[in-house]
Amino acid sequence: MEEALAGHAGDAGTRRPRARPRRRVSVIGVIGELLITAGVITLLYVVWQLWVGDLIYGAERNATGHELSESWALEYPLPTASAAPDDTEAPDEPVTAEPVILAEPADGQEFGVMHIPRFGDDYAVPMAGGVTRETTLDPIGIGHYPGTSMPGEEGNFAVAAHRTTWGKPFNRIADLRVGDAIVVETQEGWFTYRFRTLEYVTPDSVEVLLPVPQELNVPPTTRYITMTSCSPMYSMTERIVAYGVFEAFTPRTAGAPAALTEAAA
């Protein structure tokens, strides 16, 4: 009996544990994991592009715009007052002059800064020639349609910018109200336009760029501004178009116009 028990115990001690079956790695499983990883990376990129990146790009655009304004202010300092003004005199009227028309800029060449009080006190987006993404819209901000008028010139001064991504300069274009100031600053001074109306068109509606928007073969007698961007948000199926009319040109020697500091009602 004891030998029998010993024999069984010896057999039990020499037994090896069964090896667990190896998990087979299937091709479908690998593909699934790769797709999940790619999806996470894509999601992170979208979050960066639409939110985090926009905040960074927007701040950079405004900083560059303010730097341009400051550099022009240093080049054209305001004249020093020779005497204190007489309190009995009526306040001075805003100083305006005949607009100084710039030459059309080359693709990607900066020429101005756009200020829109409705969009905030710090809104100061650089403007450059051309409307290509690679040269102007992505790296700079607002682009001028080649062949259209320049600021203050009779006809249609037409510009474009992103509504989403890359700092989204025209993100709030639909918030404009009748009478809102749209101020274009150049080294010569400030061109003030007043917003009039919005329109939604198809992407091929190039008539909005005519000297008189939407009017073929009509000679211009007014100075317009036309701002275009994609619509609806995150889509390119339509274009949103904002129109404005010219109000005044303020030479740099006269100081910034009051329109720049208007409170958005």
What do these predicted ranges mean?
Residues 1-28, 78:
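Terminal targeting segments of Actinobacterial cell-envelope proteins
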Residues 23-24, 29-30, 37-265:
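Solvent-exposed, non-transmembrane regions of membrane-associated and secreted proteins
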